[in-house]
A protein has these predicted regions:
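Short loop segments at secondary-structure junctions
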Residues: 16, 63-65, 78-80, 101-103, ...
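Residue-level signal for short segments within beta-strands and strand-turn junctions
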Residues: 62, 76-78, 149-151
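Core segments of cupin and vicinal oxygen chelate
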Residues: 13-68, 128-130
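Vicinal oxygen chelate
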Residues: 1-3, 12, 35, 70-72, ...
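Eukaryotic phosphotyrosine signaling hubs
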Residues: 91-95
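Helix-adjacent hinge/juxtasegments
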Residues: 66-76, 81, 86
Length: 151
């Protein structure tokens, strides 16, 4: 029997977390939820297995959800480890997705606020679901964001 669980957040570690928070608020209408976090101490070192870990950031309420919905947690560590730019076929977390009214407009807003395109807009029919217009893009820090429009 499965454990009782509730999905609560997705975490993005950012080089400039305040800039990334602004991006998700301005482009997607996310809103800060709760206080700004400033965390450190033995408990965080134990959880992360990183000595002297210190992180700051905030949770963002996602569009389409109320106060009890999942959040996008955007944090920055004092010490970061750089990695290659994410690709769509990389093992592990690959992208986050937003359903939007108009993919074209959403993509332009994303680009205007510092994001970029990964591929081009495509349309396909998904049997039993509908028609999907979709594109992959990147936020200002290179994380892949899927924009999808269903009809």
């Amino acid at each position: 029997m499965p454990i009782r669980a509730k999905y609560v957040h997705t975490n993005l570690i950012a080089r400039e977390w305040k800039r990334l928070v602004r991006f998700y608020c301005e482009v997607f209408g996310c809103e800060p939820k709760g206080p700004e976090r400033d965390m450190s101490g033995a408990w965080l070192d134990n959880v992360t297995s990183l000595p002297n870990a210190h992180l700051t950031g905030v949770h963002l309420r996602l569009p389409g959800y109320g106060d009890d919905g999942p959040t996008l947690e955007i944090f920055g560590y004092d010490q970061l480890i750089e990695s290659d730019l994410p690709t769509a076929n990389r093992c592990g977390l690959a992208h986050i997705a937003f359903a939007v009214e108009h993919v074209d407009h959403a993509l332009q807003a994303l680009i205007a606020d510092g994001g970029s395109e990964v591929g081009s807009i495509a349309t396909t029919k998904v049997e039993g679901v509908g028609t999907l217009r979709v594109v992959y893009a990147r936020d200002p820090e290179g994380n892949i964001v899927e924009l999808q429009e269903w009809s």
